[in-house]
Design a protein with these regions (language model features):
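Short beta-alpha connecting loops at secondary-structure transitions
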Residues: 37-41, 104-107, 174-176, 239-246
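Short hydrophobic alpha-helical runs that function as membrane-insertion/retention elements
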Residues: 199-203, 222-223, 367-370, 391-393
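Conserved phosphate/anionic-ligand binding catalytic regions in large, soluble enzymes, centered on
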Residues: 232-233, 237-254
Length: 470
């Protein structure tokens, strides 16, 4: 099932298919790409004119009806008033009307129900005393269409706090919060705490701020000194994490493999190697992530099958790698693979449990095991570098623990029950890999988080690589 839409409908779909298995006895694949509480952080070093242009495109293009659209503009206190004054002026120059005309900037929302929901939200904010600004360029031709169409004027709502916005408003409504420079880490934590992680923008000329935001934000697509919409296939692979989507990213190397029931284990590695021949891969982080796997490989000296699996998974693992993607001059696009935080591993056989452990350690994730005799005994026997990556939890309520991926070995009835229990959870959709006892073809790419970063290098003075062209 491939789905684009709301988080609520994606959750219903997952619960609907959780009780079904395919012809091979595996869970039905679900790729869900949902919405987000997308923010843009603007500090005092940003160029205001460029910020306004990018905010208009990100918040109001397609009448704000893009899943990637900007929903919350976060302005540093020192430049908030000046930026808002210029933004209000720009909004007042926008023409709203028939999108078939080239002179139109903002078209209608999709239907009358959407219009009513958006207007209800705006009225709720007004009743709470929040400043609301609406403006559009007056034109008699457009005005006639407003009466018969489902139009909502571009709207600016000032909030006291990011947490005031509890859900995505899918339309031409931009919320604004102000922040103190010293409170930037807390602001990023608030954005992460929303649970959504689709797009995030940052406008700044300070490299340290770029590194701080991109290094700590839990979002699938990050944009620096540019707008946040219009991702291009193969240039900015698109898709979120958490409540914003299951992965893999559309337009990225992992997507088509998610649709295959069977494929060679090395297929993804071959695909990436072909790409790496043209653009070198940065794998500095991978070495640090795989240290526990190396410890498990040494411990398995008398277990040749497990040792061979450790070697195989270690060679196939791609977590901790960053790749430069093709793109226009003046823009730098990278695609990074990171490990999921914690993987629930369920098995009733020691060899299967160790197979799961090797796969999870290969990508650098933590392991969640049921607290039973089999797994307690294994934890005691394993080296400390490995056992430190394992958490035990009571088996009867283990699905209530935090985890973002599942690997299961067992029979189909147990697998179906596990899928239903995982689907019944609140929060982000979690995918389950199911295998019969003894299988070792675990798909490591299902344990990755993908991050796309698009940087407007021209905004910081130009593309220095052009100087090397001879």
């Amino acid at each position: 099932v491939m789905f684009t839409g709301s988080t609520e409908v994606a959750t219903l779909l997952q619960r609907n298919i959780a009780s079904r298995l395919d012809a091979q006895g595996r869970p039905i694949p679900l790729i869900a790409e949902t919405g987000g509480m997308n923010a843009m952080i603007v500090d005092s070093s940003a160029l205001t004119e460029q910020v306004v242009i990018d905010v208009l495109a990100s918040a109001f293009d397609s009448a704000g009806q893009r899943c990637s659209a900007l929903r919350v503009l976060c302005l540093q206190d020192e430049i908030a008033d000046h930026t808002l004054k210029m933004l209000r002026g720009a909004m007042a120059e926008c023409r709203m009307g028939n999108p078939g005309r080239l002179t139109t900037d903002i078209g209608p929302v999709i239907d009358s129900e959407a219009k009513a929901n958006i207007e209800r939200h705006i009225q709720t904010m007004r009743s709470k005393g929040r400043p609301v600004f609406q403006a559009v360029r007056e034109n008699s031709e457009d005005a006639r269409e407003w009466q018969s169409g489902t139009f909502v004027a571009p709207t600016l709502i000032e909030l006291d706090d990011f947490a005031e916005l509890q859900k995505e408003v899918f339309g031409p409504v931009l919320h604004v919060v102000r922040y103190n420079r010293n409170q930037l880490p807390e602001l990023i934590e608030q954005i992460n705490a929303s649970g959504y992680g689709l797009t995030l923008g940052v406008h700044t000329r300070i490299d340290e701020t770029i590194a701080q935001v991109t290094g700590s934000a839990h979002v699938g697509n990050l944009y620096v000194n540019r707008n946040m919409v219009g991702a291009v296939v193969g240039v900015q692979p698109f898709g979120g994490e958490g409540l914003s989507g299951t992965g893999p990213k559309a337009g990225g190397p992992l997507y088509l493999y998610r649709l295959l029931a069977n494929r060679p284990e090395s297929a993804l590695a071959v695909t990436l190697a072909r790409q790496d021949a043209e653009y070198p891969v940065d794998a500095q982080l991978k070495a640090a992530l795989t240290q526990p796997l190396n410890a498990l490989r040494e411990w398995a000296a008398n277990r040749p099958e497990l040792q061979a699996l450790c070697t195989q998974y270690g060679e196939l693992a791609q977590a901790g790698t960053q790749r430069l993607l093709p793109g226009p001059t003046g823009e730098r696009n990278t695609w990074t693979l990171l490990p999921r935080e914690r993987v629930l591993c369920i098995a009733d056989d020691e060899q299967d449990a160790l197979t799961q452990l090797a796969a999870v350690l290969a990508v650098g994730s933590q392991v969640l095991w049921p607290d039973d005799a089999l797994h307690r005994q294994l934890v005691k026997a394993l080296p400390s570098a490995v056992s430190e990556r394992i958490q035990l939890a009571k088996a009867e309520n283990i699905t209530a623990q935090p985890f973002d991926a599942v690997i299961f070995h067992g029979d189909s009835d147990q697998l179906r029950a596990l899928c239903e229990a995982v689907a019944a959870r609140d929060g982000a959709i979690v995918s389950v890999q199911g295998f019969t006892r003894g299988e070792s073809n675990i798909l490591l790419e299902r344990l990755y988080i993908e991050r796309s970063l698009s940087v407007n290098t021209a905004a910081a003075g130009g593309n220095a690589s052009l100087m090397t062209i001879g």
